[in-house]
Amino acid sequence: MSEAKAEILRRIREATADGPVADPVQRTYRRNSSRDRAEVVEMLRDRLIDYRASVRDETEQTVAAAIAELLGPDARYVVPAGLESDWLPADSRGAGRERITEPAVGHTGERAAVRGAHDGEREPLSVDALNEVDAVVTSSTVSCAETGTIFLTGRPDEGRRAITLVPDHHVCIVPLDSVVELFPEALARVEATAPITMISGPSATSDIELERVEGVHGPRRLDVILLDRAR
């Protein structure tokens, strides 16, 4: 620690030494849901639709066709290296849609080049390259139904934050077994040091004259697939 910083902290401690003792933080909030699974999933669906996301139900047998429909016939889209390949359309160069597979990037920034479906080994896409991509398809870590919030934490099936912020269209897969009701339940499933991105609907802001503008801080289109892996 520098001498200047140490001096600043010393003065702060000295100035606040005689201050009042803070009241203890109340932690009597709910930590576990009492609702059944169907209620929790419906709560998440209602919240996401209210936030102007589209929501559809799929199984592992139908999810690839659903993603193909959502992307359209000519999309150029990026997927993280760890996403289940069986969930994706069987796209190849010259077949209309083009899939770009990004390498896995750990929390420390360490890169592991991977061989994509048809792209060979590649480095992570630059921001300029991502700006030329139509969409991104990822999975998710956990979703909080109470707030309608999807958590991404940089896992191999979600990729780094940039790929979910720059493209204008995000197709996000939410496995039903990852849906919880309460925020404390969601945080309990998140690695403490993970880079967390929380998504509650398409990107939108009303900062200027309270007029809603979409797509300022991320994708303006969010399609959520509630994936039932038990069927």
Please give the residue ranges for each predicted region.
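The feature marks the mature, well-folded catalytic cores of soluble enzymes
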Residues: M1-R231
